[in-house]
Every structure is written in C-alpha cells, then in structure tokens.
Design a protein with these regions (language model features):
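Glycine-rich, acidic and aromatic/proline-enriched surface loops and short helix-turn segments
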Residues: 65-79, 90-110
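Short, cationic low-complexity segments
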Residues: 28-33, 94-99, 183-186
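Short intrinsically disordered coil segments
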Residues: 19-23, 85-91, 175-182
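Assembly/oligomerization scaffold segments
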Residues: 1-82
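Short, intrinsically disordered, mixed-charge
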Residues: 19-21, 102, 138, 142
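Short secondary-structure capping/junction motifs at helix and strand boundaries
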Residues: 35-39, 44-45, 107-111, 144-149
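Short beta-strand-centered interaction patches in the first periplasmic/extracellular domains
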Residues: 67-69, 74-76, 111-186
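Second-shell loop/turn segments in exported
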Residues: 14, 81-90, 118-124
Length: 186
C-alpha cells in the first residue's frame, strides 16, 4: 500500500523538527461497516503503520501556516527497494510470487494466491521482488480456468495474486433489483 498525505503545519514543526522522509506514519481510521441489507453495522477500525519515503515540500498557505505533502509506503515497499534478487527461480508463477512475498519481502500479512499452471524458470538478474511478481503476473495462466488475467495487489486483508475470473467468482456484497413501473396506458 502507498499513498500521499497533505497536512497543515501551524507550529513550524517541519522547520523545527525536520521531516526528512524516514519517519513512521501510523494511520488509524474509523469507518462504519455496511451490513447486508444496506444498514450500518459496527465501526471498523483500520490501524496501519507506514513509512514516509518522500517529502514533497511545504507551501505557505498564510504567514503562519504551511501545507506539507508527504508520500508513504508500507514496510514491504521499503524492503522491496532494498532487496535485489539475483538467482534462478523455479516453480509455478504463483509459487514464485508467494516465495517473493514470504521469503524475500518477509511479509507477515496474509497472502492469497490462486494456483497457476506449469512449472517455469525465471533467471532473476538484479531485480526487485515486486518486479519478479509483476513478471509472474503478466505470464501466469490460471490452473483452474486457463485464463491469463492475473492481478497483483494489496488490500487491508493482505496481498493478492489471482486472476480476474476468481474475483468475479466471489459472492456479491449487495444485490440490486430494478423494478419497472407496471402502469399501462389504454
């Protein structure tokens, strides 16, 4: 996960306690969940740690206030930029993707992997784990449905390496019914 954040600095913190791009950012977001039927349920609390990896700079809003923009990334993004893979990888593309996440990026998050077909060999020559996963994503064919439509993404529940068809196969969260007006004109 990655994103950017803009905040106002009323106290000159950016100048007095400089933000240089190596700080930890903790986002704690409270959001109501939607129950089946459309009613609101208990609030969900999203609590995640990120690392600031870029400071866009500060822009003066008025004499005592400046707006500061920072970019942030999850720990796996930081690790990905520091790790170089330089070896031969053998297995299905889904196995290789899982290996990159678990062994190389050392993620503790849940990894959802849809099995792909065929044993492959990748000669990694000084590339990042995410580069290898993206290569696997572009070439993988689903073992279950034979489709080459893999996607790789991260959600709040973990990392996903799966085909578009498997995402379509999940049950709908809501159903929408269109009712036509049955009035007749004589």
């Amino acid at each position: 996960l990655q994103g950017n954040l803009v905040f106002t600095d009323n106290f000159g913190l950016v100048n007095n306690l400089p933000i240089i791009g190596q700080e930890t950012l903790r986002l704690k977001i409270r959001t109501p969940s939607v129950m089946s039927g459309g009613s609101f349920g208990e609030e969900q609390i999203i609590d995640r740690l990120f690392y600031i990896n870029k400071v866009q700079g500060a822009k003066s809003v008025n004499p005592n206030v400046q707006a500061v923009a920072v970019d942030f990334v999850s720990m796996e993004g930081i690790r990905n930029n520091r790790i170089v893979v330089d070896r031969i990888l053998t297995g299905t593309y889904s196995d290789i993707a899982k290996q990159m996440l678990k062994s190389d990026l050392k993620t503790k998050k849940t990894v959802f992997v849809e099995p792909s077909s065929g044993v492959k060999k990748i000669i990694a020559n000084e590339v990042t784990p995410i580069d290898i996963i993206n290569q696997c994503k572009n070439q993988a064919v689903s073992k279950e449905n034979g489709q080459p439509t893999y996607k790789f993404f991260e959600t709040l529940t973990g990392f996903h390496f799966r085909s578009v068809q498997s995402m379509y196969a999940t049950e709908s969260a809501q159903q929408y019914i269109i009712v036509e007006n049955e009035s007749s004109v004589d």
